[in-house]
Curated annotation (Swiss-Prot):
Protein name (database record): Acetyl-coenzyme A carboxylase carboxyl transferase subunit alpha
E.C. number(s) listed in UniProt: 2.1.3.15
Catalytic activity: N(6)-carboxybiotinyl-L-lysyl-[protein] + acetyl-CoA = N(6)-biotinyl-L-lysyl-[protein] + malonyl-CoA
Upper classification of the organism: Bacteria, Bacillati, Bacillota, Clostridia, Eubacteriales
InterPro entries, alphabetized: Acetyl_CoA_COase_a_su (IPR001095), ClpP/crotonase-like_dom_sf (IPR029045), COA_CT_C (IPR011763)
Family label: Belongs to the AccA family.
GO process annotations (BP): fatty acid biosynthetic process; malonyl-CoA biosynthetic process
Protein purpose: Component of the acetyl coenzyme A carboxylase (ACC) complex. First, biotin carboxylase catalyzes the carboxylation of biotin on its carrier protein (BCCP) and then the CO(2) group is transferred by the carboxyltransferase to acetyl-CoA to form malonyl-CoA.
GO MF term list: acetyl-CoA carboxylase activity; ATP binding; carboxyl- or carbamoyltransferase activity
Gene: accA
Organism expressing this protein natively: Heliobacterium modesticaldum (strain ATCC 51547 / Ice1)
Localization annotation: Cytoplasm
Keywords of the record: ATP-binding, Cytoplasm, Fatty acid biosynthesis, Fatty acid metabolism, Lipid biosynthesis, Lipid metabolism, Nucleotide-binding, Transferase
Amino acid sequence: MALPLDFEKPLFELETKIDELRTFSQEKDLDFSSEIATLEQKAEELRKKIYRDLTPWQQAQLARHPDRPNTIEYIRLLFEEFYEMKGDRLYGDDPAIVGGIARFQGRPVTVIGHVKGKDTKENIYRNFGMPHPEGYRKALRLMRQAAKFSRPIICFIDTPGAYCGIGAEERGQAEAIARNLLEMAALPVPIISVIIGEGGSGGALALGVADRLLMLEHAVYSVASPESAASILFKDASLAPQAAAAMGITAERLKDLKLIDRIVPEPSGGAHRNPIGTAKELATALSEEIENLLALSAQELVDSRYAKYRNLGLHCIEDASCGTFEAEATDASGT
């Protein structure tokens, strides 16, 4: 288990005391059941309070938690008969994106998602979830195949952003992302994308042009990381908490802005504390959304998807309550 985040430490310390008391009780054959029950109740109350009152910056930290389930874990928990398919048929494979065919509740689907590693070795192999162009081209190859065989597409988004190394730029990173946006907009099959952790910039958007964009309760979605935004706009990366508050990166804020379609609740304490419970909530949401989308014809899907993205931002034009970055940044920093 990874070290707790700063705001999780009071809960971690209380849970450690409960474990120590339970172990001591068993070793000494003593009955501390009432004391343990009291502490467990306090822990549950503290857990609810901590995760109910998270700031946007704390949400960003939680979205990056090393123990948070990644795409591979959700594939294992949600799908049957997954068969991975590799390579873009142009350059090579990219482990930062995994994809293939599977069954979801008996229905054939195509599954694609960013993958972060669970330890240093795997993070290096997965490039910390930052895809190269071949990753996005592999994803598009699988989407085209899904359209050919009339399979719904389910994408999992969890990336700090597309990799910006020299090799990636030489192989056409911007073109690969743009091509995905263009072709996803016109695919004649249902597309559901789920932000399960970080949704960073164009690297996330390249898997995010969907009929339904879902977001886990403690995930984040933004044009840049809070650190990058603070460095660019405030010339000080240490102001990332203020930038996070101003950027509107949380699921609740994005739902208010009509930029996402549905928030998928996480169990108390977040997905990293209960992956199975999170997967159950996600399975329910995916099942409902797929059924709704399958009721539409191919042309209706494409038309409604086009209208959905043409209307993005109109909410803010028509409703002055959206505010501005400068105003919200000032409120957040108090200056």
